[in-house]
Amino acid sequence: MFYLIKKLPKFILFSLYLYAFSSISDSSGILSERLNLINSFYSTVRQKVTSSSGDIVQESKGEIWIKKPNLFKSILFSPYENIASSDGNTLWLYDSETNQVTINWIKNIISDSPLYLIIKNNKNSWENFNIKNINDTFYIYSKKLNSSFRKITIIIDKKGILKNLIILSNTNYKTYYTFNIKKTIISSDFNFNFKIPKGAYIDDQR
């Protein structure tokens, strides 16, 4: 196969490269258009974390609800329950292992966090990133030296259906999220608030 590839004329290889990797500006526009198709969804999700050597560190299952512009709730059930929830103003992060709730304003959420980028999806957000894509797979690299990640991979189809999210951390740990979207409309009476469990330690950072 490699021999055959070497025999291809240079201009064909160049054309294939251009086809496979759209320009950064084109990729950014395509990704933004697809994310704009997402208004809300409910999905089951599988999470897998691997170390820099590829060993599986953790596997879990959960659920996630997202409703633009800034409503979301996610629950991971194993190995212990973790909940992240926002009512549009307040962000709650609950860790059942330590029985601790961390509270913050949603406006203070890190601007380059993957969830923030997917929900907000505005032009200003993508100016801080280099983006390339091959078909439905988008590779996102931060221009900031102090970014919270090295690379994000988003797989989203032309209908705006989110399939996968892969986050490569600065320590070379990878977190894989596989989505199985069940609904694209969330009821208006769905509760995005979080009820703090009795006896939980509260770390209020507002």
From Swiss-Prot:
Monomer. Belongs to the LolA family. Residues 1-20 form the signal peptide. It comes from the Bacteria. One of its GO terms (cellular component) is outer membrane-bounded periplasmic space. Keywords: Chaperone, Periplasm, Protein transport, Signal, Transport. Participates in the translocation of lipoproteins from the inner membrane to the outer membrane. Only forms a complex with a lipoprotein if the residue after the N-terminal Cys is not an aspartate (The Asp acts as a targeting signal to indicate that the lipoprotein should stay in the inner membrane). Pfam families: LolA. One of its GO terms (biological process) is lipoprotein transport. This is Outer-membrane lipoprotein carrier protein. It is found in: Periplasm. The lineage of its organism: Bacteria, Pseudomonadati, Pseudomonadota, Gammaproteobacteria, Enterobacterales. InterPro entries: LolA/LolB/LppX, OM_lipoprot_carrier_LolA-like, OM_lipoprot_carrier_LolA_Pbac. The keyword Nucleotide-binding does not apply.
